[in-house]
């Protein structure tokens, strides 16, 4: 019996995503200082937070070094080799972030060497036929920005806009797709409501203020990017969750921020990882982080985003899977539902798997493994996992075989 083939639209972008702090190594920012102060504390929290099977499978969670990003994957120096692998694996695009603290380590002081570094990154991508999707804020900020109150400072949107102008002016003509903010709601919630990210505040009013300032930061950046390059495309990466039978959560988490900026976006980036259902669905497979795997949720989220009448790129989708036992099926199952949404006139134009490489998973450290490519953090050796070759076949054929 012949297999059914699901073709994706011509020109569909197939790629992977990373962020600067998670892969580059050597960053000095608010987060790098915070992780050093909290590493020992996280080892103690691990025993309370994670389940027994996770503790047994990943004993490194009890080592302070797990929580300090350090050299990470050293992508800062090895980016050309990593892009060679991406090209070899059939990718057509790559999403990465520019580290604000490298460009503006002190307020108003611009590091031209770092601008040149990112210029070389973009050139290396172009030479390999990889379309860059560039994020400008992926959770990390310079220390000076943090000392001024971070996203609670009324001037914060203007500080960010100044950085955006500097980057855009210096990299003019090299970037077609800009992502101003990555998961603004999630980061603001963790930083100012739940207190799990720096600066560890727990205040609903501070959370709402940060969200409003992030929305304003995007609006200013959107206008600046288009003043500098009229033809560029500008959007955000929004972490939407499928909420079944929880409409208030769906509105507040998925739609409220997008509604604020709906006039200032050329596309929507969707980061999809998880769902929440009431009553809770039983016996679903889980990732190493114990996140339930529910591929159909991405279909529902995409159908909901259709109302904004904007092109959509799936800017992140992946799972922690150190043994690579579920990643291939996870990817195929999500792509099946993405394809179904496309057939029902949802304008999805690209898919970026999270992630190209194993990387530093923020407050969880190094033990969760999200990469299509395994990284030995001691030797920095890269080894493509079996799922990387399956994804490569999909990328090259622009099709999914069931």
Across the structure, where does each feature detected by a protein language model lie?
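Non-catalytic scaffold segments within catalytic domains of secreted glycoside hydrolases
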Residues: 1-83, 87-92, 97, 101-402
